[in-house]
Amino acid sequence: MMIFQIGWAALAAIFTFSIAMVVWGRNGDGSIDI
């Protein structure tokens, strides 16, 4: 069960990170580029 929880935590972290990257990218900051 621990592996299952770690997997979900990692998935949520990656999802949140990708959303944040899209938001920051659309803000026109320019300091963060991918």
Curated annotation (Swiss-Prot):
Q: Does the keyword Transport feature in the UniProt annotation?
A: yes
Any keyword Electron transport? yes
Transmembrane regions: 3-23
Give any single GO term for biological process. Answer: photosynthesis
| GO CC term, one of those recorded | plasma membrane-derived thylakoid membrane
Q: Which GO terms describe its molecular function?
A: electron transporter, transferring electrons within cytochrome b6/f complex of photosystem II activity
The record's keywords, sorted A to Z, are: Electron transport, Membrane, Photosynthesis, Thylakoid, Transmembrane, Transmembrane helix, Transport
What domain of life? Bacteria
Q: Where in the cell is it found?
A: Cellular thylakoid membrane
Per UniProt, subunit arrangement is: The 4 large subunits of the cytochrome b6-f complex are cytochrome b6, subunit IV (17 kDa polypeptide, PetD), cytochrome f and the Rieske protein, while the 4 small subunits are PetG, PetL, PetM and PetN. The complex functions as a dimer.
Function in brief: Component of the cytochrome b6-f complex, which mediates electron transfer between photosystem II (PSII) and photosystem I (PSI), cyclic electron flow around PSI, and state transitions.
From the Swiss-Prot or TrEMBL record, give the protein name: Cytochrome b6-f complex subunit 8
What organism does the UniProt record list as the source?
Answer: Prochlorococcus marinus subsp. pastoris (strain CCMP1986 / NIES-2087 / MED4)
The gene it comes from is petN
